[in-house]
Curated annotation (Swiss-Prot):
Record localization: Cell membrane
Organism classification: Bacteria, Pseudomonadati, Pseudomonadota, Gammaproteobacteria, Pasteurellales
Family membership: Belongs to the AAE transporter (TC 2.A.81) family. YidE subfamily.
Native organism: Histophilus somni (strain 129Pt)
Segments passing through the bilayer: 4-24, 28-48, 67-87, 95-115, 157-177, 370-390, 402-424, 438-458, 463-483, 495-515, 529-549
Protein's recorded name: Putative transport protein HS_1470
Disulfide topology: none
Keywords: Cell membrane, Membrane, Repeat, Transmembrane, Transmembrane helix, Transport
Membrane topology: Multi-pass membrane protein
Cited NCBIfam families: PRK03818.1, YidE_YbjL_dupl
Length: 552
């Protein structure tokens, strides 16, 4: 067999063993995809005993390409909600997640100075302690730039030592916070539901009867509140007739307006217009119907809603827009992206015409445009290779193969499309590429570090490294958890999701979800902090490496 064939067979063996190990669970918690790392260590141990070696250049390429695939698809997945999470109600949660990352970096700095651990070892321990594989790849790249030899193998070994408690430490933190504050989960869920009912930001509807005589004869757009674009009027009932109003529709007393918007905005509109009435207009007889359609027509990508002309031509109004799971109030200036889900209302005989303009071709949602994928990867690698010179630093700072593709993917996913190119990727395709990438990366890391793993654990400093990893995992989580609960009064279920998301750890999310099944509270906060946390986890080892290198 050729060297390439042998290498591929070994990688396949590592993946099979590792994924099998990852499926082992103790009380519902397992290593997950991290099992591939230990599969690589096991195979490498026996390869080392039998004197079998693989081509280093081939392994290096596979490792880097796997990392690029993983971080790029992560960026495409979380990009649409990344910038929104920084500006919306997730600001507090993202601030706490940032605190966890900063405290972790401080812990690394303290350990490096106090116990005099080698730079490659402490960065490997850090990546394992926070259970973040792209962090490992970013650290390995910057250490190679600094000229540290054997950084790949030693960092991988240290990562493997710290990884198991990295998972267990998150779960232990959740349990101790619950014990310390004597938290009752049922009450936490009720409090969250009550608070979310008062401050809910998702869209809702209300029917308001016009009783304010000052509004009679005004155009719809001239009513105070509609100019803020926070509320949409999707239907108007006048006597027994239901129609789709336009901005120029003249309002009369006793008209019933079907409004869509956030609760606080709707409350203000009711004060201006009149009284709320219990009249489900969606069930009234008439020639109107509503549909949910998906933007798939390449010709409308990037176009503003006002330029579609579907209201003037067909009397159709867009009442809601769902983008990457986030509901938005559409305005005339909202630009459409591939995969946007629109809730439209119009006459039965014309709504089909509007649908054909927007697309709604379900088969396109299952197709992957490969050209944008490779454009994005290429741009990401180029960005990651650009040096940033900072006075006083011994080497130029780079985003690297972990940071560059991630940043580009976040930006492209936020843009959505350029001309006929769109960066939407079906969830199944995204997951497949992401899993292939991380399996390849972890398999090679395990193979590179596994030769001396057992010897380091039994006869070397393996147990010490585990202890350092526990410190880096546990201290930031507990400090932030106590601050969030004691001073910021954060809901416990949201706090559990925050802890799991700040460590970008799916097994911890599974544990948090199991605390109160079917609530979805932990998953919501996890998704809120995950994008920023992933970005910070990739950048932090590079900054730590340069700062600690200059302090040597």
């Amino acid at each position: 067999m050729s060297d390439i064939a042998i290498t591929i067979c070994i990688l396949a063996l590592v993946a099979v063993i590792g994924l099998w190990i990852g499926h082992w669970k103790i009380r519902g918690v397992g290593l997950g995809i991290g099992g591939v790392l230990f599969g690589g260590i096991i195979v490498a141990h026996f390869m080392n005993q039998n004197g079998l070696k693989l081509d280093a250049h081939t392994l290096h390429f596979i490792q880097e390409f796997g990392l690029i695939l993983f971080v790029y698809t992560i960026g495409i997945q979380v990009g649409p909600g990344f910038f929104a999470s920084l500006l919306s109600a997730g600001l507090k949660l993202n601030g706490l997640a940032t605190l966890i990352v900063v405290l972790g970096a401080v812990s690394v700095f303290v350990l490096y100075k106090v116990v005099n651990v080698d730079l490659d070892i402490i960065l490997g321990i850090y990546s394992g302690a926070v259970t973040n594989t792209p962090s490992l790849g970013a650290g390995q790249q910057i250490l190679t730039e600094l000229g540290i030899e054997n950084a790949n193998s030693t960092m991988g070994m240290a990562y493997a030592m710290a990884y198991p408690f990295g998972i267990c430490g998150i779960l232990l933190s959740m349990w101790l916070i619950r014990l310390f504050f004597k938290i009752k989960v049922e009450e936490e869920e009720k409090q969250f539901q009550k608070a979310s009912g008062q401050d809910k930001e998702s869209l809702t509807t209300v029917n308001v009867k016009v009783t304010n005589p000052n509004l009679s004869g005004l155009r719809l757009i001239d009513i105070p509140g509609f100019d803020n674009k926070d509320v949409v009027c999707s239907r108007l009932k006048r006597q027994e007739n239901i129609s789709v109003p336009s901005a120029d529709t003249i309002i009369a007393i006793d008209d019933v307006l079907h409004l869509v918007g956030e609760i606080n905005a709707l409350k203000k509109m009711k004060l201006v217009i009149g009284e709320e009435i219990d009249m489900p207009m969606t069930h009234l007889a008439g020639d109107l119907r509503s549909e949910r359609i998906v933007v798939t027509n390449e010709k409308v990508l990037g176009k503003r809603i006002k330029h579609l002309g579907i209201h003037k031509k067909y009397g159709v109004v867009i009442s809601r827009l769902n983008r990457a799971g986030v509901e938005l109030v559409p305005t005339a200036n909202t630009a459409l992206q591939f995969g946007d889900v629109l809730h439209i209302v119009g006459r039965s005989d014309t709504i089909g015409n509007a649908t054909s303009i927007i697309g709604n071709a379900q088969q396109k949602l299952q197709q992957v445009q490969m050209l944008p994928v490779f454009i994005g990867i290429g741009l990401g690698v180029l960005l990651g290779s650009i040096p940033f010179y900072i006075p006083g630093f011994p080497v130029a700072l780079k985003l690297g193969l972990a940071g560059g593709p991630l940043v580009v993917a976040l930006i492209l996913a936020r843009i959505g499309s350029v001309g006929k190119l769109y960066w939407f990727m079906p969830p199944s395709a995204n997951l497949a590429l992401r899993e292939i990438g991380i399996v390849l990366f972890l398999a090679v890391v395990g193979l590179k570090s596994g030769g001396g793993f057992v010897d380091t654990l039994v006869h070397g400093q393996g147990l010490e490294w585990m202890g350092y990893g526990m410190f880096i995992t546990f201290i930031p989580l507990m400090i932030t958890g106590i601050i969030a609960r004691l001073y910021m009064k954060l809901n416990y279920l949201s706090l559990c999701g925050l802890l799991a998301g700040s460590m970008t750890d799916p097994p911890a999310l599974a544990f948090a979800n199991a605390i109160k099944e079917d609530s979805g509270i932990a998953a919501l906060s996890y998704a809120t902090v995950y994008p920023l946390s992933m970005f910070l986890r990739i950048m932090s080892p590079q900054l730590l490496a340069i700062l600690l290198w200059t302090a040597m």
